[in-house]
Amino acid sequence: MRIGGLQKFSLLDYPGELSSIIFTQGCNFKCPYCHNPELVVPEIFRQPLDTEKVLRFLYRRRRKITAVVVTGGEPTLQEDLIDFLRLIKAMRFKVKLDTNGSNPEMLSRALYYQAVDYIAMDLKAPNELYQKLTRSKVKIADIMRSMEIIRLSGLPYEFRTTVAEDILFGDDLFRIRDLLKEGDRYYLQPCNYSTTLDDLARHRLKSPNLSSEESFQKFKDWAEQHRVLLQVRGE
């Protein structure tokens, strides 16, 4: 495992649980608002943390935390992810996996081996804007397949989208509804623009007040009609 960081304690990242967060190195997307560029750009990768030391740390935290969040970067790019998750599960922790949905095969393996308890998947944009926003070659079929795998898993899950003016907002944001289905839990979250992958983007990024926007109200009305639980984080 290439582990680029460790946050010892969080009350926010796993709903209802006290967790530690493990950040993996490497990502196949290059979203301009990404606030962890040191996990995305190989030229600025830090020396990876020793995996055995991370596991020993978690073992010592068994009475202080109840869960571990594995995020990135993009965790499903790690070839030994499943073995790592199973070692965490063996310590009786709940495991939350964050993913961009680009690797449905690895997601299926994680579920097959019962290595996760909660899945959070980022929805970056409506289908026609995916490659533009992520600045990467994206197979929309993989995104759709990952969403369906997650829905059928029987596990708690969420889909979420980062909102930033000039990048994804208004009617573009509303078109993400085409990816959602009845019963989905969907979060909109403001971008963290203190640090971003794209230095130029940082100077023009703004997190809009969604609740005051007409397009958000339209999205909210649609969600209620289609039984999608739509919530806003950070407001």
Predicted regions and their residues:
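Conserved beta-strand termini and adjacent loop/short-helix elements that scaffold enzyme active sites
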Residues: L6, Q189-C191, V232-E235
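Canonical Radical SAM [4Fe-4S] cluster-binding loop centered on the CxxxCxxC motif
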Residues: Y14-L49
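Class I S-adenosyl-L-methionine
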Residues: S19, S211-S212, Q231
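A C-terminal junction/extension of Radical SAM enzymes
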Residues: S215-E235
